[in-house]
């Protein structure tokens, strides 16, 4: 059965054409349903309005296929928004905004406001314990105790290359992640607490730095907030056969942090042979690297 053309409907699909496409979408022939799916997707986000009521269809197969199309359309919207963010903003983009936009490209239905409220609540709990204490190593001790001991966040050493480790919502859901995304979480909590915490993009690792006029320490968030000295960082670089450069210990900008996160995901999806995601992250890397 041929998928109907819509050339006679410049203002959008007619009701008759929508009905025909839905009938074809529920067809048992995979070739027919696939063609109908492609035709509906070609309508873009405008198709969402008339598709949504069919999530309550009496036909299970139609409900399932409509839900999949709506999810795909939301992913496309999120992809467009994040790519525009990458192209529009430079090195000093807002890290939290970028991290949530990135997460929505894979999990388009996440409740970002809900996650942000949880981060606010975590910061409020820590702030209550700190009282009027100014930025100090004690602040890090309280933050680390709450994050790693009470809430149980940890580095995911067993499944280091799981893509979920790189999406902030999944890091919060599972309380585990990779070095860079755990550092983003730490960084965002530090910002809420007005602590001088920044990210540091070491070769083959990512840590945070806490610096005041009297103290400078590096925080290995992946290893439950282990505090490192400058000498420890240099020793790590020597152990991995990397010559030391002062720039390695410099603060990473938000844009460079997102670039590294996307580059990591691009490599992970390449290794997993997930070509669609690999191509998507290649676009993000190119866009972020322009700045």
Positions of predicted regions on the chain:
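A structural boundary/capping signal
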Residues: 1-291
């Amino acid at each position: 059965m041929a998928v109907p053309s819509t050339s006679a409907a410049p203002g959008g699909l007619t009701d008759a054409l929508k009905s025909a496409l839905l009938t074809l979408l529920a067809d048992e022939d995979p070739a027919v349903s696939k063609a109908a799916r492609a035709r509906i997707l070609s309508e873009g986000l405008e198709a969402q309005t008339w598709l949504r009521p069919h999530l309550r269809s009496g036909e299970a197969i139609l409900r399932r296929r409509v839900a999949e199309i709506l999810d795909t359309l939301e992913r496309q919207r999120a992809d467009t928004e994040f790519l525009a963010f990458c192209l529009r903003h430079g090195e000093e983009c807002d890290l939290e905004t970028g991290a949530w936009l990135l997460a929505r490209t894979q999990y388009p239905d996440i409740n970002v406001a809900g996650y942000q409220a949880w981060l606010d609540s975590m910061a409020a709990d820590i702030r209550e314990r700190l009282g009027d204490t100014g930025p100090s190593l004690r602040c890090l001790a309280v933050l680390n105790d709450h994050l790693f001991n009470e809430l149980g966040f940890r580095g995911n050493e067993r499944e280091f290359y799981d893509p979920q480790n790189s999406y902030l919502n999944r890091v919060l859901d599972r309380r585990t992640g990779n070095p860079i995304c755990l550092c983003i979480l730490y960084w965002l909590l530090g910002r809420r607490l007005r602590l001088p915490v920044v990210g540091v993009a070491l070769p083959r690792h990512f840590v945070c730095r806490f610096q005041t006029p009297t103290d400078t320490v590096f925080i290995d968030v992946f290893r439950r907030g282990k505090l490192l000295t400058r000498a420890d960082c240099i020793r790590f670089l020597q152990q991995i056969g990397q010559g030391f450069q002062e720039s390695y210990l410099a603060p990473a900008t938000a844009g460079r942090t997102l670039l590294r996160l996307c580059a990591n995901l691009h490599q992970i999806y390449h290794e997993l042979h997930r070509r669609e995601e690999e191509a998507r992250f290649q676009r993000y890397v190119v866009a972020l690297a322009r700045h």
